[in-house]
Amino acid sequence: MPLNEIVGVVGNLISKGYIKKQSVIDALMSVPRHKFLPKNMEEYAYIDSPLGIGCGQTISAIHMVGIMCEELDLNMGQNVLEVGTGSGYQAAVVSKIVGESGKVTTVERIPELFEKSKQVLSELGYENVEAVLGDGTLGYLENSPYDRIYVTASGPNVPKALFEQLNDGGIILAPVGSHFQTLMRYKKTNGKIYEEKLLEVAFVPLIGENGF
């Protein structure tokens, strides 16, 4: 991995206040983003921008991955669900933060992206990540309940199934909206859901039974 490039990007995110937690900094520094991109896009891997990965999908900008990890308040040992694997990059970053005692289940609906991301995650040794082919808007009941759930595509609302599969005290992070989207954080406390608007964002549409 071109260390000087990722050091520059992460240093910039720290100086702008996007990322603060050492665990997030360490994870972003250690995951080789270029490995999750098509060969013809590898040279752009450490530009802090979303990039196309095929099938009409994108890999999120590095700052957005960092912000989401910060806002999820990730810690070692947590059980995490990712809705929308895409390239697999964000699942890899999250897996570094939750560590070997934690687990990341990531669900992708597009077979081509599922196969590619599963292969890369396996080759790079992310053993605490389980890749699943399916409709992420239904969650993934088999590995629930989850301490943290995050969605990497924007839907009209957060699917009910995700709240049902969330532990009490757990957090869901999801972009909501169509043309104008807001990154929302939901916390379940004593069975009640409390929501908070974080920032305006731009994600691909959430497709599925409980999406668009």
From Swiss-Prot:
GO terms for biological process: methylation; protein modification process; protein repair. It is an enzyme of class 2 (transferase). GO terms for molecular function: protein-L-isoaspartate (D-aspartate) O-methyltransferase activity. Its EC number is 2.1.1.77. It catalyses: [protein]-L-isoaspartate + S-adenosyl-L-methionine = [protein]-L-isoaspartate alpha-methyl ester + S-adenosyl-L-homocysteine. The active site is at residue 60. Keywords: Cytoplasm, Methyltransferase, S-adenosyl-L-methionine, Transferase. The keyword S-adenosyl-L-methionine applies. InterPro entries: PCMT (IPR000682), SAM-dependent_MTases_sf (IPR029063). GO terms for cellular component: cytoplasm. Pfam families: PCMT (PF01135). PROSITE patterns: PCMT. It is found in: Cytoplasm. Belongs to the methyltransferase superfamily. L-isoaspartyl/D-aspartyl protein methyltransferase family. NCBIfam families: pimt (TIGR00080), PRK00312.1 (NF001453), PRK13942.1 (NF010549). Catalyzes the methyl esterification of L-isoaspartyl residues in peptides and proteins that result from spontaneous decomposition of normal L-aspartyl and L-asparaginyl residues. It plays a role in the repair and/or degradation of damaged proteins. This is Protein-L-isoaspartate O-methyltransferase. It comes from Methanococcus maripaludis (strain C6 / ATCC BAA-1332).
